[in-house]
A protein has these predicted regions:
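Hinge/capping helix and adjacent helix->loop/strand transition within the periplasmic-binding protein
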Residues: 86-91, 106-190, 239-241, 252-285
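N-terminal (or domain-start) structured segment
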Residues: 27-117, 155, 164-165, 177-202, ...
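N-terminal secretory signal peptides that target proteins for export/translocation
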Residues: 1-6
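C-terminal lobe and pocket-closing loops
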Residues: 114, 210-278, 307-310, 324-325
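An extracytoplasmic/periplasmic, membrane-proximal ligand-sensing/linker region
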Residues: 33-35, 175-178, 263-325
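N-terminal signal peptide c-region/cleavage motif recognized by signal peptidases
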Residues: 23-25
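A ligand-binding cleft/hinge motif common to bilobed small-molecule-binding domains
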Residues: 99-109, 166, 170-175, 202-236, ...
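Bacterial N-terminal signal peptides
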Residues: 10-21
Length: 325
């Protein structure tokens, strides 16, 4: 009897010691200890903002701390990024499309922040990016669009958001050998209005921006640039499927840390983001905003960013733009 009790007691101590060694408290376990800030590079009600708020709501419940979402749109994402880095705070993270900063070296000399200080924590989603045309243009595919552009060189107008997507579409035109005229817009609402009326013929934005006009029948999506089809547009091909690989890119969106955040905390956040991403309710809401839920932790997210940088560098060289050293 005594032997059994000592055996049981010994087993209990062994189990307790094992739990202590495995679950030893770390900075990651103790984080967060106060409210967290999400700084978002885009404005309220954008797809990225909606996604940030959905994740913030679920993470706040897990972490038992409030999460404040701050929108800092403008300046090609630079306003939000510089504000984030100047906080020097391990309870502040940046939520942004990767495109917000990967093209900065080609447009800003000097770049007003150190990109090496942006550490990828977790990918949240891929924003669906659409190649959209007015329905009145009477084209039903990218092949049709190419044929029309060849028949009317320089007569068709196009636009995208400034920066990353500029390079992608310009690279596509160069690769295919088409001539279209770019029309710059400061406000996406103006571009959508002009697209629906036929004033411009091609617009390549986040699908969420043109979705109301697509549903109204005034705008048509010819393809999505993402590497996989979007469940919200099951009959629309990817650019690669349509025969135009130069248009392929994913609208990567993720969470970034500043140098003040340690690796253990970053790993905790990434793990918690993945658990939220697996929630069917989150998947449904994100799909409704034109986003593909695509969780990826630190190293995987960083690899996807690097993969996206390479083709943009090649396109930049075509137009004489060189990265700022």
């Amino acid at each position: 009897m005594i032997r059994v009790r000592w055996a049981r007691l010994g087993a209990w101590f062994f189990a307790a010691a094992t739990l202590i060694s495995v679950g030893r408290p770390s900075l990651a376990v103790d984080w967060p200890t106060r409210p967290v800030r999400f700084i978002v590079t885009l404005g309220a009600a954008s797809g990225v903002d909606i996604g940030a708020r959905l994740f913030a709501d679920r993470l706040s419940a897990q972490w038992k701390q409030p999460i404040v979402v701050e929108n800092r749109p403008g300046g090609d994402g630079i306003l939000a990024i510089t504000s984030f880095l100047s906080a020097h705070d391990d309870h502040t993270v940046l939520v942004t499309p990767v495109a917000a900063f990967t093209a900065h070296p080609y447009f800003h000399d000097p770049v007003p922040y150190d990109a090496e200080k942006l550490t990828p924590i977790a990918r949240i989603s891929n924003t669906v990016v659409a190649v959209a045309v007015p329905t009145s243009l009477n084209v039903n595919s990218l092949k049709d669009l190419e044929a029309l552009a060849r028949a009317q060189p320089g007569k068709l107008n196009w636009t995208t958001a400034t920066g990353f997507t500029d390079f992608v579409f310009a690279g596509y035109l160069h690769t295919v050998g088409l001539k279209m005229e770019k029309v710059p817009y400061k406000n996406p609402a103006g571009a959508v209005t002009d697209l629906a009326s036929g004033t411009i013929q091609v617009y390549m934005p986040a699908y969420a921006i043109v979705r109301p006009q697509v549903q109204a029948g005034a705008v048509k999506v010819l393809a999505v640039t993402n590497h996989e089809r979007f469940s919200g547009l099951p009959n629309i091909p990817t650019a690669v499927e349509a025969g135009y690989p130069s248009l392929e890119f994913d609208g990567l969106v993720g969470i970034f840390a500043s140098p003040e955040m340690n690796a253990e905390t970053r790993a905790k956040i990434a793990q918690d983001v993945r658990s939220v991403a697996n929630d069917p309710a989150i998947l449904e809401r994100m799909t409704a905003t034109g986003q593909i839920v695509s969780p990826g932790e630190g190293a995987e997210f960083e690899a996807s960013i690097e993969k996206q940088k390479a083709p943009i560098a090649e396109v930049a060289k075509l137009f004489g733009n060189k990265p700022v050293q």
